């Protein structure tokens, strides 16, 4: 009997970054060659990690294993990173490998832990120049997550968020309050500094009769209300002060692990919370524009599994611009067809 080979095994390239099974500075190991019975551990040079990575494969093909190996390399190279995991297994696996020397670097975000809810306020703004970006991104997240959407809904929601951002300690819970409580709305509008935003509330919105106003805000109340009605979500985004500062985590090379287990949170809530977190990381990276020299922006690695669940319209912007802010993405999913066309173009143009 003759066994026919369908392909020829080639010798690994001479320039392949090999580690010899040991920790090697400057290399992130993730595989083994077995040419002619000789096993050699190899990886990717850390300098090449400055480019984004896209990992694709169906369930059981090793995506999570590869993500874990790359993350472990960041841990042992004392680099900062964030993990956004919609399943929970990847996040819990990483927690097991955190060495004692880096335990104090870790922020573990687990919404399912209702006894110890960690605060995360997507509307918390440290730089007043970022208010416009924050408003646009929050609208983008909600738009991505809801099937029915209209221009009037987006118009009112945008001015609602812009008004709330001028008052410290407001949260997403205040969106519905702004649209239903006259006294609260007046207090917020009194704090508004942008003349266009103020005119919307004092002239345009104030001119609407009760019936028209009720019909106009109803879709927002339905959509935002459904999200904040979940006590698990409300315990987190209802806190005016975030327990952690994403920009500080990035600049100091710390670790942020986000466990968004869909089995515990529900698929819709996990998707919105994940999109809000990815958006917060994006905005924090963009705020690094206040560091003049690109080389002074500490490298930070963001890992997003099943990233199509969290990809808003601006995700393409993250992929195309994040590197200059020191944010390096590694994203994974199962099928190319899961990505919206604009995100697909950005992925293949920047990885």
Question: Predicted regions span which residues?
Answer:
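An aromatic-glycine-centered, glycine-rich loop/turn in mixed alpha/beta architecture
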Residues: 1-30, 231
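P-loop NTPase motor domains
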Residues: 30-38, 46-48, 58-59, 66-327, ...
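Conserved pre-motif I regulatory segment
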Residues: 41
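Walker A (P-loop) ATP-phosphate-binding motif of ABC ATPase nucleotide-binding domains
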Residues: 52
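Conserved H-loop
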Residues: 86, 332-338
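A short helix-turn-beta junction within AAA+ P-loop NTPase domains corresponding to the substrate/partner-engaging
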Residues: 345-351
């Amino acid at each position: 009997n003759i066994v026919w080979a369908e392909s020829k095994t080639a010798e690994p390239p001479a320039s392949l970054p090999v580690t010899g099974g040991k920790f090697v500075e400057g290399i992130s190991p993730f595989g083994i060659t077995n040419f002619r019975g000789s096993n050699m551990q190899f990886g990717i040079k850390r300098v090449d990690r400055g480019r984004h990575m896209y990992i694709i494969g169906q369930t059981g093909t090793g995506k999570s294993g590869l993500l874990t190996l790359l993350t472990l390399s960041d841990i042992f190279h004392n680099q900062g990173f964030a993990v956004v995991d919609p399943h929970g297994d990847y996040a819990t696996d990483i927690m097991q490998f955190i060495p004692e020397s880096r335990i104090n670097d870790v922020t573990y975000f687990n919404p399912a832990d209702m006894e110890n809810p960690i605060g995360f306020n997507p509307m918390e703004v440290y730089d007043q120049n970022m208010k416009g970006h924050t408003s646009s991104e929050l609208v983008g997240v909600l738009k991505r997550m809801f099937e029915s959407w209209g221009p009037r809904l987006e118009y009112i929601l945008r001015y609602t968020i812009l008004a709330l951002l001028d008052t410290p300690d407001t949260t997403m819970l205040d969106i519905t309050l702004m649209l239903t409580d006259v006294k609260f709305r007046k207090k917020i509008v009194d704090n508004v500094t942008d003349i266009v935003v103020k005119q919307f509330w004092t002239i345009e919105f104030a001119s609407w009769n009760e019936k028209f106003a009720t019909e106009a805000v109803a879709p927002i109340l339905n959509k935002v209300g459904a999200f904040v009605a979940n006590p698990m979500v409300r315990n987190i985004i209802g806190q005016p002060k975030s327990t952690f500062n994403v920009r500080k985590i990035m600049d100091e090379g710390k670790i942020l692990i986000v466990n968004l287990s869909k089995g515990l949170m529900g698929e819709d809530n996990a998707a919105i919370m994940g999109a809000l977190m990815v958006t917060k990381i994006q905005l924090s990276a963009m705020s690094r524009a206040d560091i003049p020299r690109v080389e002074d922006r500490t490298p930070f690695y963001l890992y997003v599994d099943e990233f199509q669940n969290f990809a808003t319209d601006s995700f393409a912007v993250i992929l195309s611009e994040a590197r200059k802010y020191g944010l390096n993405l590694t994203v994974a999913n199962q099928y190319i067809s899961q990505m919206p066309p604009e995100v697909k173009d950005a992925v293949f143009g920047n990885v």
